[in-house]
């Protein structure tokens, strides 16, 4: 007997939905949701497909996720073609198996089972799905959230299916995420001959003391929910490629992952004060990818913990570590946001895979969360 979760996951993996393309994944999900009474509103923006679907009314629990996947890398290094889902030794292989087509399949099947058992459920069950999460994330969830907020849509709880687990399904639940802000810094000098440094102004030499000070700063000490804010230099570029030319400009890109103890405004202020103090001739551009958010213990966290304890017989850790997710946009609606998904050990890697049994377990957890919040 085939498992409906695995079957749907395989159908989704077969579609090579490299971000921001969907390749028919959402149509497959929409067909299943409409069959059980969901109203579906396609919400395309630019080159991105999104949809918002709901069933029932009242207190709202939304399941959020993305149909797009990252590139496969060298397909010759895969044991099987990345878009030909394969089950081997109990593992489901394929690009997106863990991030996050397995979660999408678990969500849809959970909704089917929930509606069959609770055809007249009290609250509203919803889905917010995008094909633009892995790449720019500019025309996906952020745009849908803007549209929903503009018409005063209510969203009480949101379960994001990102692969949160580390060793066993549910061992880690993300109840928040750090903020992320990136600086693109250009330090301007004067190009010249290395034999005549007095006729030039080397921006690399100028910048080094400032950068040394920058990387040594303790931005904050974090708190009980967040680790300390971290800063990492990601890219440095300077020079013409010749060994006898002093560069005229230096580019440095650095990123902050910041806790609720810092703000993007205070980070900008401290960085720019440091650059001014070192008397650098510079220009700087900032890109804020997301603010930090935290969902404290409450109805959603309690429901998720209950579901994990019921099916996995373990108490999950509540963490805010890792990268950003679309939860940062949904949190702006005032919703409680929690991430629960498969084990993340192989995400974005060659031979991405997930235990088939884990997806079955995850679907049962999702169903139990629905039963606790909107039945």
Curated annotation (Swiss-Prot):
Chemical reaction(s) catalysed: N-succinyl-(2S,6S)-2,6-diaminopimelate + H2O = (2S,6S)-2,6-diaminopimelate + succinate
EC number: 3.5.1.18
Binding site for Zn(2+) 1: 66, 99, 162
The record's free-text note on cofactor binding: Binds 2 Zn(2+) or Co(2+) ions per subunit.
Cofactor(s) the record lists: Zn(2+); Co(2+)
GO biological process, one term: lysine biosynthetic process via diaminopimelate
Pathway: Amino-acid biosynthesis; L-lysine biosynthesis via DAP pathway; LL-2,6-diaminopimelate from (S)-tetrahydrodipicolinate (succinylase route): step 3/3
Active site annotation, chain numbering: 68, 133 (proton acceptor)
Top-level EC class: hydrolase
Binding-site residues, Zn(2+) 2: 99, 134, 348
GO terms of molecular function: acetylornithine deacetylase activity; cobalt ion binding; succinyl-diaminopimelate desuccinylase activity; zinc ion binding
Domain of life: Bacteria
InterPro entries tied to this protein: ArgE/DapE_CS (IPR001261), Bact_exopeptidase_dim_dom (IPR036264), DapE_proteobac (IPR005941), Peptidase_M20 (IPR002933), Peptidase_M20_dimer (IPR011650), Peptidase_M20A (IPR050072)
Matching PROSITE patterns: ARGE_DAPE_CPG2_1, ARGE_DAPE_CPG2_2
Record's keyword terms, sorted: Amino-acid biosynthesis, Cobalt, Diaminopimelate biosynthesis, Hydrolase, Lysine biosynthesis, Metal-binding, Zinc
Homology family: Belongs to the peptidase M20A family. DapE subfamily.
Functional summary from the UniProt entry: Catalyzes the hydrolysis of N-succinyl-L,L-diaminopimelic acid (SDAP), forming succinate and LL-2,6-diaminopimelate (DAP), an intermediate involved in the bacterial biosynthesis of lysine and meso-diaminopimelic acid, an essential component of bacterial cell walls.
Self-association state and partner proteins as the record states: Homodimer.
Protein name according to UniProt: Succinyl-diaminopimelate desuccinylase
